[in-house]
């Protein structure tokens, strides 16, 4: 049995890697959306920079990017440009301890559907025209029609070039 997976699109190899690397470090939006269930969420944003700090402006809500992920300066070419932000469902949560840990990475979203999966709940959310899925604890109080505040783990944010769909930050 092999230890690498080949991800292809239209007969063209996109990435060859271990399952974990495909999941954690996808080379483009296709691979990011292909690996994982539910698939990665993609949100429209604009990359901004204030001093040495980068963030993604999602239309008023700004998700700051950790310094250790941006220190190489590779994002400078994208400042002021539209990007796609990727975040996996398990890296979005409404649990109080998670919220307290990520106070600067929060936004309000509308719960379209709350789906009990047994050991977890999938929240299908709408945020400023973007659809998102959050994988939360079965103790979540969020229900259909609610506006819920959720937080992101900024260390798990991915950025993609909006034109080429190639990864610019994992």
What positions do the PLM features span?
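Internal alpha/beta loop-helix hairpins
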Residues: 1-62
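Short, structured coil segments at secondary-structure junctions
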Residues: 1, 127-128
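Long, well-ordered amphipathic alpha-helical subdomains in the mid-to-C-terminal portions
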Residues: 104-113, 117-124
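Conserved positions in beta-strands of structured domains
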Residues: 14, 20, 46-48, 90, ...
